[in-house]
Amino acid sequence: WVIKNKDGGMQKNHTPAVMDMLQYSLSPLHTGFSFIDAGCGNGWVVRYMNNQSMCETAIGVDGAIEMINKAKRLDTEGQYILSDLMDYKPMKKVDLVLSMEVFYYFSNPSKLLNHIKKHWLQSKGRLIIGVDYYKENQGCHNWSENVGTPMEMLSRKDWVDIFITSGLSNIKHWLSCPNNDFIGTLVITGTVS
């Protein structure tokens, strides 16, 4: 996306849903917290989180070297890690993991969710994800073919079931930022017991 100079457009298009996800996740927090952006792209969410007074640590992880390099160019003080999400294990577990438009790139999203639950999230930690690529969103059905990248097409129910099966608690889901042309970003969240 960076090579094609499309990361800025992704940031602009995803900002409303990400802000909705963050508002939901941060509103109950009253103490300092730690954060990971899983699939951080150019690092815009990490930069935003580093400006939040209660955020003690914000880390961005991405498997694309161009994205990590751009994130580091834009934010020389931020923590950005080049790694496949399935291989990454933070030195210290965190309170909040956010992922926007990433999980469907994995052939087994439940495996990624379980890896994050086991290795990234501390007790009472929250995972919140947003996906625009799901069965009920008819406008996305040609994305995999158009982009030339495999994507895992799941229904809203399938996504929620992955969270339930993982053993996460307090699972919630909703469609964020719908409009006349778009059914909305599917947001799913849950916490570690």
Predicted regions and their residues:
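Short, glycine-/aromatic-enriched active-site segment of Class I SAM-dependent methyltransferases
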Residues: 131-150
